[in-house]
Amino acid sequence: MKIALGIEYNGTHYFGWQRQRDVKSVQEELEKALSVVANHPVEVMCAGRTDAGVHGTGQVVHFETNVDRKMVAWTMGANANMPKDIAVRWATEVNEDFHARFSATARRYRYIIFNHALRPGILNSGVSHYHGHLDEKKMHEAGQYLLGENDFTSFRATHCQSRSPWRNMIHLNVTRHGHYIVIDIKANAFVHHMVRNITGSLIAVGKGDQKPEWIQWLLEAKDRKVAGATAKAEGLYLVDVDYPEHFGLPREPIGPLFLPDNLN
């Protein structure tokens, strides 16, 4: 049978999602825990591989097993055998044609900036920090130039291995909630560092260094060197993955849980 899981994790102490030799990864910890529950080696496939320091509240994985377990056994059993900064949120049996990566129709990220003169102590690894004033309305205005199907070369890491820089941006919203600024981005898929590179450029607009129209110019320039700096990893969360309804996956609060689900 094939099982899908929803995963939440704090990426601070991991070298990204993907299992790698000699370094700590989220995938490795999850697979070790699931292998204990299944009593056989388990390998998972994920919806999107996150980089070192990046968090997830809506990661989705699947794995195959011939072991008959109640769904609660997968959630409770895995959580009992994992570090406390990784948690399984739900488990459900899925059709054999389901694939966590290839069945996904869209991914959604939130980038969170603590916009205050002083850095935070408690959430220091869960948010990015910018000390000067940021104009979230101008940042939102700038982000609208990225909507639709575009060539995102200017916002793509130089070592990105994706065959094409073209992606379809479904929404990009920038909102303020007290001292928190949230950049909420949804697209069919993302090139490497796309959200963090867009965020770095939006911060330049929010600071007043650039006008909102600059983002349109960056898009047309197709040159990574002229765009803003890559924003830090700690503010970024993979919060949701869309799938066709017939797969019947659970819908959970998007998160991260210190923010309201609906930010409008």
Curated annotation (Swiss-Prot):
What UniProt keywords apply to this chain's record, in alphabetical order? Isomerase, tRNA processing
One of its GO biological process terms is: tRNA pseudouridine synthesis
* Superkingdom classification of source: Bacteria
Instruction: Write down the Gene3D superfamilies for this protein, in alphabetical order.
Output: Pseudouridine synthase I, catalytic domain, C-terminal subdomain (3.30.70.660), Pseudouridine synthase I, catalytic domain, N-terminal subdomain (3.30.70.580)
Kindly identify the residues recorded as the active site. Answer: D51 (nucleophile)
Keyword hit for Isomerase: yes
According to its UniProt record, this protein's enzyme class is isomerase
Q: Where does substrate bind?
A: Y109
Keyword field contains Transferase = no
The catalytic activity of this protein is classed by the Enzyme Commission as 5.4.99.12
MF terms in GO:
RNA binding; tRNA pseudouridine(38-40) synthase activity
Catalysed reactions listed for this entry: uridine(38/39/40) in tRNA = pseudouridine(38/39/40) in tRNA
Concerning HAMAP family, the annotation shows: TruA
Subunit and interaction comment? Homodimer.
Q: What does this protein do?
A: Formation of pseudouridine at positions 38, 39 and 40 in the anticodon stem and loop of transfer RNAs.
Spell out the family assignment given in the record's similarity comment: Belongs to the tRNA pseudouridine synthase TruA family.
Listed PANTHER family: PSEUDOURIDYLATE SYNTHASE, TRNA PSEUDOURIDINE SYNTHASE-LIKE 1
Protein name (database record): tRNA pseudouridine synthase A
